[in-house]
């Protein structure tokens, strides 16, 4: 940083919290205000006090029974024009406050451990992360869905509202991208716990971690850049209003300001853990630390603290202690450090650290370019006579080293970090250092000798230590801080001349008027353009088409190829023929117990030959007595489990298709509907695995399954169920191309959100409106665009 550049200086110090300040967030009202949360169990609202260049505590809120860990602002609404404050705590709860209420308006319960991160989206959506390894999506006072996939605490969450995307960062070292409740992508690269996330744009975000690194990512998965500078855990990251530059805070007692991809300024604080930060609209930086004090830093001369306040801050900083094990000072041997006279030499760059010996003490100083002086940043503890065994490892670029030397190559130029472990070869380390930094190889011997000289005591038979820089020869050495899925053919593999067709893609029950599921062209009447006859759908859509002769013919043909111990007997085949005839002829006669037992036996045939039996089941399950027999509380779990196993993506497409159609037909009976609702999590999660294929009939069956679930959820107003179904619909819409499947998904969506403002808000927050807009211009079939426009009117 050049002397002409503006730099941040203290604006004010705010005292009020009694313990660590763990979270900060800017708020729109009052203008320029922010909210803080603390281990003292309180939440405080601070508003600017312009005449005094400070802030006034406007409001103190309580509601948690344990430490408060995180905070975010829920944007304004008609009911709450100034927005709401959401806080998460160690009591596993999320408290929601208005800006003028000392107690919560309501409390969100559901997490099983500390809530450590919060982020808000559009329409009142809230995303929370917890030590229980999950993230949860909330709408108003209800949990809409739970995001499961991380294997350790979810330390960071962010919402990208424009695309309906969500990000979670975890102690499992990964970041995950979620769409409509499903994990779309996992970002790997960090070598330790991910602690913070920040959004740069609709396509890029930042992450920081315990590995002391910051990474810039594209949402498509690429890591664009890695930034190093901190020497210990990075706890928080916040972006400037320009959405390019950012600030970070860490366990190394520092706030670091990053501009144009480089660390432009380092500000030391008189506290060990700098837990949190936020950037105000005017560019000022607010920082919370383990000493319970909130500090504001500014570039503005008008908002800079008085000379007395800055002097008091520097005095407080000078009295701080720096643990050589956890600071960024590398290996320290007090006996070999220069004395106070070393401070007469000016530094070469902003934030440069220098250690000096003052009697028995070791003091750390930081160079200020703008002031042209060394500022004391603390006394180093654990350094007198220290060697590397007692002073610990140094963290650099996410790895631990015995030493990390800072080397200035040219006067006033950048410094380079040279990491080294005592088990390394000095010459190989020197060679790698020169190669990495594109430096002249003629310095190889000098660098290697520098390493050897400055690691005395760790290598036998080596010379005395020296603090000379191998490039300048001066006293420049500063001990420094450092799946594919199965692709199915587009055409149904079971169709063709004279071949048995297991069901049809476009069969459904009727609605009032002409059924849009039949594809009847009369559906394009003028009335349909003004009246919504598409949704809400009131009854389940089923797959009814049957050709008993072909089904039985294929059953007998495949049975003849089965192993003897797996074959159906002639009597078995006769019983199956009777039940099929009974079903197809709409007989008032009920299937016998024996017939139902044989049907169960038939659907348990080997997977290579079972699909004709599944087709009989698909037709039979609509019969009340068959539905009750297979779907009752006693038998239902085993029945559904068997069919779910057939949905294996590596299984036979015919079995997948007919199992899905059977599930769709189960909804016509009371027992079947109850079973489908009780098994929805397992069924939906397995069914969605089939979305990646290109078999249009499977896509239509998936869409129909979603539609039938939406019919049930519309009846009982189950908001969590609606959230699951919205996730299913959104996920299928991402890949489906067949317009009949698309139409059924649109009807399902319309049914879910009809007469339910919460469901409308959730759909909007998931970005479903932007997902379906393209269908509003479909010309054929017209039912697709007409249905889409009705939905967009609701959204």
Curated annotation (Swiss-Prot):
GO terms for biological process: cellular response to lipopolysaccharide; inflammatory response; macroautophagy; negative regulation of protein K63-linked ubiquitination; nervous system development; phospholipid metabolic process; positive regulation of dendrite extension; positive regulation of neuron migration. Induction: Up-regulated by tumor necrosis factor alpha (TNF-alpha) (at protein level). ARM repeats lie at residues 546-588, 589-620, 621-669, 670-715, 716-755, 756-795. Residues 533-794 form the PUL domain. It is found in: Nucleus; Cytoplasm; Synapse. Residues 366-465 form the PFU domain. One of its GO terms (cellular component) is cytoplasm. Signal peptide: none annotated. WD repeats lie at residues 17-56, 63-107, 110-148, 149-188, 190-227, 229-268, 270-307. InterPro entries: ARM-like, ARM-type_fold, PFU, PFU_sf, PUL_dom, WD40/YVTN_repeat-like_dom_sf, WD40_repeat_dom_sf, WD40_rpt. Gene3D superfamilies: Leucine-rich Repeat Variant, PFU (PLAA family ubiquitin binding), C-terminal domain, YVTN repeat-like/Quinoprotein amine dehydrogenase. It comes from the Eukaryota. The PUL domain is composed of 6 armadillo-like repeats and mediates the interaction with VCP C-terminus. Interacts with ubiquitin. Interacts with UBXN6, VCP and YOD1; may form a complex involved in macroautophagy. Plays a role in protein ubiquitination, sorting and degradation through its association with VCP. Involved in ubiquitin-mediated membrane proteins trafficking to late endosomes in an ESCRT-dependent manner, and hence plays a role in synaptic vesicle recycling. May play a role in macroautophagy, regulating for instance the clearance of damaged lysosomes. Plays a role in cerebellar Purkinje cell development. Belongs to the WD repeat PLAP family. It is linked to Neurodevelopmental disorder with progressive microcephaly, spasticity, and brain anomalies: An autosomal recessive neurodevelopmental disorder characterized by progressive microcephaly, spastic quadriparesis, global developmental delay, profound intellectual disability and severely impaired or absent motor function. More variable features include seizures and optic atrophy. This is Phospholipase A-2-activating protein.
